[in-house]
Amino acid sequence: MKNLIIAKRYSKALFNLAEEGRMIEQYGEELDNFVRLLGKLPELADALRNPLFPEATRKAIFAAVAEQLALTPIVRSFINLLIVKKRVEHLESIAQYYHRLIDEYSNVARAQVKAAIDLDEKVIQEIAKTLEKMTGKKIVVEFQKDPSLIGGVLAQIGDFVLDGSVKRQLLNFKETLKRGALG
């Protein structure tokens, strides 16, 4: 919970700066590049997080990396602030929440769509169009094959779930039978 609060606070601050400077996408890409680098080089992540290293050393290490990544001054200052405040371990969550803010700003919703079989791109586009009509937002579909659904489709956008799977229908039928047998 604390991680989410921190991620929201810091990502909103960076997003507000990005919005003022019309750099929303740029800052998001820079955050992603840095997070990916930390994932590839865990020793770098450890060095930036480790309070045993003096703050000046951690900042110098970051400055060299920032130079190589050609980070903008705002993103450099932002990550330096995370180093000073000992919040580098939250950077991945901050980047994820930052992308949620981009989606909200751009009126985009991400839909997780699951089906028992692989779906044609055309079918996925039709599902996206239907969801766009329902939500009034541009839908980005993230498809996943899930044989446990038996058949049909399950679509989820945030907390909103449309479950048209055979699995759900069978579970509903089972509940109906239980109620009928008991009632």
Swiss-Prot record:
Q: Which GO terms describe its molecular function?
A: proton-transporting ATP synthase activity, rotational mechanism
Top-level taxon of origin? Bacteria
InterPro entries xrefs = ATP_synth_OSCP/delta_N_sf (IPR026015), ATPase_OSCP/dsu (IPR000711)
The record's SUPFAM superfamilies line, in alphabetical order, gives: N-terminal domain of the delta subunit of the F1F0-ATP synthase
Please state where this protein is localized.
Answer: Cell inner membrane
Q: How does it sit in the membrane?
A: Peripheral membrane protein
Q: Which family does it belong to?
A: Belongs to the ATPase delta chain family.
Q: Which PANTHER family match?
A: ATP SYNTHASE DELTA CHAIN
Q: How does it assemble?
A: F-type ATPases have 2 components, F(1) - the catalytic core - and F(0) - the membrane proton channel. F(1) has five subunits: alpha(3), beta(3), gamma(1), delta(1), epsilon(1). F(0) has three main subunits: a(1), b(2) and c(10-14). The alpha and beta chains form an alternating ring which encloses part of the gamma chain. F(1) is attached to F(0) by a central stalk formed by the gamma and epsilon chains, while a peripheral stalk is formed by the delta and b chains.
Q: Which HAMAP family match?
A: ATP_synth_delta_bact (MF_01416)
Role noted for this protein: F(1)F(0) ATP synthase produces ATP from ADP in the presence of a proton or sodium gradient. F-type ATPases consist of two structural domains, F(1) containing the extramembraneous catalytic core and F(0) containing the membrane proton channel, linked together by a central stalk and a peripheral stalk. During catalysis, ATP synthesis in the catalytic domain of F(1) is coupled via a rotary mechanism of the central stalk subunits to proton translocation.
Q: What is this protein called?
A: ATP synthase subunit delta
Originating species = Syntrophobacter fumaroxidans (strain DSM 10017 / MPOB)
